[in-house]
Amino acid sequence: LSFTHKVTARNIFRYKQRMLMTIFGVAGSVALLFAGLGIQSSVAGVPSKQFQQIQQYQMIVSENPSATNQDKAELEEVLKGKDIQAYQKIYSKTLDKDFKGKAGLQTITLMMTDKEDLTPFIHLQHHQQELTLKDGVVITAKLAQLAGVKVGQTLEIEGKELKVASIAENYVGHFIYMSQASYEQIYGQLAQ
């Protein structure tokens, strides 16, 4: 053994507290490294699943409620232009719900369309089964978990009861999807 190896061995056996601190320090650092790499690999797939498989739209254009008919006609012309492959009008509303004891105040986005579904912009699915809006309200899985509701049960939002027809996969945010007919039945009015 060289002199440095002998000194190292002597110090390890002579100062047991330092030895234990070194061992636990190295073990803790390695554990943190593995935890960080594990979290990175778990989260790495979320953006592609959410924004390439589920929400496939490229842009959201909001119409000003106080826009004139001429402004609306101009917007319609732009949307029908050759640069736009497809578009779909939806009504979107942001709601807040407090899940006391679970996750606190959460923001929920309600999306309503006059079509049977939101494809090709949003793909609603549950275990590779495509979902449509013709059966009623579709909510996202995490929202269903927070609210403690399953298919066939009702979710109370803003004093309104929404009967859950389906639960869709989602990785970012909370969403409620419904058709125009469902919206009118629940709220008793057209979406403004």
Region spans (language model):
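Small-residue transmembrane helix packing/gating motifs
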Residues: 54, 168-192
